[in-house]
Amino acid sequence: NSANLQWNHYAINEILVKDSSASPLNANIATESTSEWNSENGGLLTDGDHSEAAQSADRITLPTDIVLSWPEPVSFDQIQMHCWYAQNQAPTKVSFQVSQDGQVWQEIVPPTVLAWEYADTTLENQTFSFEQVQEVRFLRMKVHDANLKWKHFAISELEVYNRQS
Protein backbone atom coordinates (compact mmCIF):
# COMPACT_ATOMS: atom_id res chain seq x y z
CA ASN A 1 0.00 0.00 0.00
CA SER A 2 1.77 3.07 -1.22
CA ALA A 3 1.16 6.24 -3.17
CA ASN A 4 3.12 9.18 -4.45
CA LEU A 5 2.00 11.57 -1.72
CA GLN A 6 4.30 14.45 -2.56
CA TRP A 7 1.28 16.78 -2.58
CA ASN A 8 -0.65 14.83 0.11
CA HIS A 9 -3.39 13.51 -2.19
CA TYR A 10 -4.01 11.33 -5.21
CA ALA A 11 -6.22 12.08 -8.19
CA ILE A 12 -8.30 10.40 -10.83
CA ASN A 13 -9.12 12.86 -13.57
CA GLU A 14 -12.17 11.12 -14.95
CA ILE A 15 -13.94 7.79 -15.18
CA LEU A 16 -16.17 7.28 -18.22
CA VAL A 17 -18.62 4.41 -18.20
CA LYS A 18 -19.99 3.43 -21.57
CA ASP A 19 -20.81 0.55 -23.84
CA SER A 20 -23.33 -0.24 -26.53
CA SER A 21 -26.17 -0.57 -24.02
CA ALA A 22 -25.51 2.36 -21.67
CA SER A 23 -24.30 5.78 -22.66
CA PRO A 24 -21.93 7.64 -20.31
CA LEU A 25 -24.71 10.00 -19.27
CA ASN A 26 -26.67 7.04 -17.88
CA ALA A 27 -23.88 6.14 -15.46
CA ASN A 28 -24.65 7.95 -12.23
CA ILE A 29 -22.54 7.92 -9.11
CA ALA A 30 -24.41 6.54 -6.13
CA THR A 31 -24.58 9.46 -3.71
CA GLU A 32 -24.51 7.36 -0.56
CA SER A 33 -21.03 6.07 -1.36
CA THR A 34 -19.33 9.26 -2.54
CA SER A 35 -19.78 11.60 0.40
CA GLU A 36 -16.09 12.52 0.25
CA TRP A 37 -16.23 14.28 -3.15
CA ASN A 38 -15.32 17.97 -3.34
CA SER A 39 -16.58 18.15 -6.91
CA GLU A 40 -19.99 19.70 -7.48
CA ASN A 41 -21.10 16.52 -9.23
CA GLY A 42 -19.55 13.08 -9.39
CA GLY A 43 -21.00 12.97 -12.90
CA LEU A 44 -17.70 14.51 -14.01
CA LEU A 45 -16.40 10.94 -13.92
CA THR A 46 -18.73 9.88 -16.72
CA ASP A 47 -19.36 12.98 -18.81
CA GLY A 48 -16.93 12.16 -21.63
CA ASP A 49 -14.93 15.34 -20.97
CA HIS A 50 -11.30 14.62 -20.08
CA SER A 51 -10.66 18.30 -19.31
CA GLU A 52 -12.62 18.18 -16.03
CA ALA A 53 -12.10 15.89 -13.06
CA ALA A 54 -13.97 14.62 -10.04
CA GLN A 55 -11.92 15.28 -6.92
CA SER A 56 -12.02 13.73 -3.46
CA ALA A 57 -12.21 15.78 -0.30
CA ASP A 58 -8.87 16.90 1.11
CA ARG A 59 -7.24 14.56 3.63
CA ILE A 60 -9.56 11.73 2.62
CA THR A 61 -9.44 8.51 4.61
CA LEU A 62 -8.51 5.50 2.49
CA PRO A 63 -9.72 3.10 1.37
CA THR A 64 -12.81 4.73 -0.10
CA ASP A 65 -15.41 3.55 -2.61
CA ILE A 66 -16.79 5.12 -5.77
CA VAL A 67 -20.01 3.47 -6.95
CA LEU A 68 -21.57 3.93 -10.38
CA SER A 69 -25.11 2.74 -11.11
CA TRP A 70 -27.13 2.24 -14.28
CA PRO A 71 -30.92 2.40 -14.55
CA GLU A 72 -30.84 -0.72 -16.78
CA PRO A 73 -28.46 -3.72 -16.63
CA VAL A 74 -25.29 -3.48 -18.76
CA SER A 75 -22.48 -5.82 -19.84
CA PHE A 76 -18.78 -4.95 -20.10
CA ASP A 77 -15.29 -6.46 -20.07
CA GLN A 78 -12.94 -3.50 -19.76
CA ILE A 79 -12.52 -0.40 -17.60
CA GLN A 80 -10.28 2.54 -18.44
CA MET A 81 -9.36 5.20 -15.90
CA HIS A 82 -7.89 8.52 -17.08
CA CYS A 83 -5.89 10.90 -14.88
CA TRP A 84 -3.71 13.97 -15.34
CA TYR A 85 -1.08 15.23 -12.90
CA ALA A 86 -1.15 11.54 -12.01
CA GLN A 87 2.05 11.46 -9.93
CA ASN A 88 0.47 14.14 -7.75
CA GLN A 89 -3.19 13.12 -7.51
CA ALA A 90 -3.99 9.72 -9.08
CA PRO A 91 -4.99 6.48 -7.32
CA THR A 92 -2.04 4.13 -6.89
CA LYS A 93 -3.94 1.01 -5.83
CA VAL A 94 -7.51 0.14 -6.85
CA SER A 95 -9.87 -2.81 -7.16
CA PHE A 96 -13.25 -3.22 -8.88
CA GLN A 97 -16.42 -5.12 -8.01
CA VAL A 98 -19.79 -5.44 -9.74
CA SER A 99 -23.29 -6.11 -8.46
CA GLN A 100 -26.75 -6.72 -9.85
CA ASP A 101 -28.50 -5.38 -6.73
CA GLY A 102 -25.98 -3.15 -4.94
CA GLN A 103 -25.84 -5.61 -2.03
CA VAL A 104 -23.95 -8.70 -3.23
CA TRP A 105 -20.61 -7.86 -4.90
CA GLN A 106 -18.34 -9.90 -7.17
CA GLU A 107 -14.68 -8.92 -7.55
CA ILE A 108 -13.64 -8.50 -11.19
CA VAL A 109 -10.28 -6.74 -10.67
CA PRO A 110 -8.31 -7.59 -7.51
CA PRO A 111 -6.32 -4.87 -5.71
CA THR A 112 -3.89 -3.61 -8.35
CA VAL A 113 -0.91 -1.28 -7.88
CA LEU A 114 -0.76 1.45 -10.53
CA ALA A 115 2.33 3.24 -11.82
CA TRP A 116 2.05 6.76 -13.21
CA GLU A 117 4.73 8.60 -15.21
CA TYR A 118 3.81 12.28 -15.27
CA ALA A 119 3.14 15.18 -12.90
CA ASP A 120 1.79 17.49 -15.61
CA THR A 121 -1.18 17.86 -17.97
CA THR A 122 -0.34 14.62 -19.79
CA LEU A 123 -3.53 12.55 -19.72
CA GLU A 124 -2.53 9.05 -18.63
CA ASN A 125 -4.75 6.00 -18.55
CA GLN A 126 -4.86 2.61 -16.88
CA THR A 127 -6.74 -0.26 -18.54
CA PHE A 128 -8.31 -3.17 -16.66
CA SER A 129 -9.51 -6.13 -18.78
CA PHE A 130 -11.47 -9.12 -17.44
CA GLU A 131 -14.04 -11.74 -18.41
CA GLN A 132 -17.28 -10.12 -19.55
CA VAL A 133 -19.77 -9.39 -16.78
CA GLN A 134 -23.47 -9.31 -17.69
CA GLU A 135 -26.66 -7.87 -16.23
CA VAL A 136 -24.64 -5.46 -14.06
CA ARG A 137 -26.33 -2.45 -12.47
CA PHE A 138 -23.52 -1.33 -10.14
CA LEU A 139 -19.75 -0.89 -10.45
CA ARG A 140 -17.70 -0.19 -7.34
CA MET A 141 -14.13 1.05 -7.53
CA LYS A 142 -12.28 0.83 -4.24
CA VAL A 143 -9.40 3.30 -3.98
CA HIS A 144 -6.95 1.65 -1.57
CA ASP A 145 -4.15 4.18 -1.95
CA ALA A 146 -3.34 7.29 -3.95
CA ASN A 147 -0.92 10.07 -4.72
CA LEU A 148 -1.99 12.79 -2.28
CA LYS A 149 0.53 15.56 -2.92
CA TRP A 150 -2.34 18.05 -3.17
CA LYS A 151 -4.23 16.41 -0.24
CA HIS A 152 -6.86 14.85 -2.54
CA PHE A 153 -7.14 12.46 -5.45
CA ALA A 154 -8.84 13.23 -8.74
CA ILE A 155 -10.12 11.18 -11.69
CA SER A 156 -10.69 12.74 -15.10
CA GLU A 157 -12.78 9.96 -16.62
CA LEU A 158 -13.81 6.36 -15.93
CA GLU A 159 -14.78 4.43 -19.07
CA VAL A 160 -16.38 0.99 -19.25
CA TYR A 161 -16.36 -0.92 -22.53
CA ASN A 162 -18.05 -4.04 -23.83
CA ARG A 163 -15.57 -5.23 -26.47
CA GLN A 164 -17.52 -8.46 -27.05
CA SER A 165 -20.65 -6.71 -28.29
Q: Which residues does each predicted region cover?
A:
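Solvent-exposed strand-to-loop "edge" motifs in beta-rich extracellular domains
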Residues: 80-87, 144-146
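Tryptophan-centered short beta-strand motifs
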Residues: 105-108
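Short beta-strand elements bearing conserved aromatic residues within extracellular beta-rich modules
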Residues: 94-96
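Short, surface-exposed tryptophan/glycine-enriched loops
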Residues: 123-138
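Short, conserved beta-strand segments of beta-strand-rich sandwich/propeller modules, principally
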Residues: 78, 138-140
